Amino acid sequence: MIMSDESMEFLSTILDTPSPTGMEMDAQRLWAEYIKPFTDEQQCDAYGSTWAVLKSSKKNAPTLMLDAHADEIGFSIRHIGENGFVYVERLGGSDVAIARGRRLRFFGTDGEVIGIIGNTAIHIREDLEKAPKLWELYVDFGCDSREEVEALGLRVGDLGVYCDGPLMLNNGKRLVCRALDDRLCGFILAETARNLKEKGIEPAWNIVFANTVQEEVGCIGAAMLTYRIQPDAAICLDVTHATDSPGLNTARYGDVKLGKGGCLCFGPACHPNLNARIEL
């Protein structure tokens, strides 16, 4: 698929906009602003879940909800030590095995603060193959005391994400970034609305494009919005694991190839009739 410059700029912007669970509103505003010209109405609930509706002209048309989530994994400050080192709790499934030495963006009362997750030099480190425990990770903000950290505007509970922004590989063939889970699918929803509008396609159903919050800690936003919307059918868009990289057993994890299109989820929670319609 060849994207327009406008679409690519929107994708890059929402990927680069921090949106850890509980702090989704900046990314939600960007998403709502982009999708607004292509839909009939836009709404946001008290927690930040945002949705836009493309209405069918048919009387008593059923409602289809298309859902992605706006939040991303990250960290929150759990403890500020007297020596100035900061200890964190993870939001969602942040992998501590790849955390050491990584830069983080934290968002305090005075704005953004950059820190680095500390890492002992390989020359003096024991258990080289051992992944650290979460409580062993500490963030270094270049401070020597708790007071210095607090002077930066940081406190317990403040949120942070990795610094990694969008990076194109192989002349644009591949895109690498934090928060592709699930900002990419929110982008797909917005682009779907744009394509329907620009091509003049009249939907047979009312379509609710939903970008929900707090998925990384239990699908909370999607559950609340489903009760509110009461759709006749719903399709959730999220990322999955490609298994075509070295060391992965396709017999165990399935045969999923990067760049070969979307995957359809099967299981007790997935209605077989809806899956069959999607496969058509």
Functional labels for PLM-detected ranges:
Residues 1-280:
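N-terminal hydrophobic/helix-forming segments and targeting peptides
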